[in-house]
Amino acid sequence: MKTALITGANKSIGFETARQLLQQGYYIYLGSRSLENGLEAVEKLKAEGLNHLEAIQIDVSNDESVKAARVEIGKKTEVLDALINNAGISGGMPQTTSTDIAVFKEVFDTNLFGVVRVTQAFMDLLQKSTQPRIVNVTSGLGSLTLHNDPTWKYYNFKAAIYGPSKTALNMYTIVLAYELRDTPFKVNAVDPGYTATDFNQHSGPGTVQEAAARLVKYATLDADGPTGKFLSDDNSPETGESPW
């Protein structure tokens, strides 16, 4: 049975991603900053007859929490087949000219450094998989090209901190994929689309089912699948790739 760790999986897109991977026969380590919320999510899925999962407390912004999660999962499996770095925060819609630097640091600590922490912590388990997959959940708001295109439908939506954190995540994904280019790894930045979740007060047009399906698609890639790409069905439905 293949295994996957999903961070921020107690609700919304992460939760639905867990459900869809469970339906494909994966064993899921459902990561949640709050263990209580994670346990509640596990019980909901078990009530649907999806039993191959367990909650893992993991705060991606906390070194000790990530290390503890690695120890806990390491007691249960020697191999991790997929890592979905889904946990993220928005930071609201601040002004770059006046927002305290602490807000920038907080968002980057989760959206970028959190991904680095978790990926490094679980790299040894991923390396033991014959088909390791890493999905870094990004956003079209991290695209420099789109933000410079006045015809883009979200051109005026300048997320002053969230956007740069995802741009940085995209570059990290490129470098990680390059470093792992001669291995079986597939590492991609995947935009699930503007989805109706509590992350955006349910303002997005997409559904969590559609968003999760995109993440699952790239978490289960075949050996000939892409790596080091910025993937988005929304921004480039004809190619599946988003402009950087």
Predicted segments with their positions:
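The beta1-alpha1 cofactor-binding region of Rossmann-like NAD(H)/NADP(H)-dependent oxidoreductases
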Residues: 35, 56-71, 101
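A glycine-rich helix->loop->beta "capping" turn
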Residues: 50-52, 72-85, 91-92
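Hydrophobic positions on the long internal alpha-helix
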Residues: 84, 118-122, 126, 172-173
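C-terminal helical subdomain
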Residues: 167, 182, 189-190, 197, ...
